[in-house]
Curated annotation (Swiss-Prot):
Keyword check for Ribonucleoprotein: yes
Protein name: Large ribosomal subunit protein eL40
GO biological processes: translation
Homology family: Belongs to the eukaryotic ribosomal protein eL40 family.
Species this chain originates from: Methanospirillum hungatei JF-1 (strain ATCC 27890 / DSM 864 / NBRC 100397 / JF-1)
NCBIfam families: PRK04136.1
GO cellular component, one term: ribosome
Keywords per UniProt: Ribonucleoprotein, Ribosomal protein
Signal peptide, first to last residue: none
Pfam families for the chain: Ribosomal_L40e
Amino acid sequence: MARFPEAEARLLNVKICMHCNARNPVRAVSCRKCGYVHLRPKNKDRKA
């Protein structure tokens, strides 16, 4: 997806809040915007 691995790591190594879809750091326990605790890792591959 990205042109070089550093950019891909910056874009894809995040967690997504299941409540408000905010981007959070990988080591986050709760969402930085809404405080929700259910976070998922961002999908690494496209569905299409």
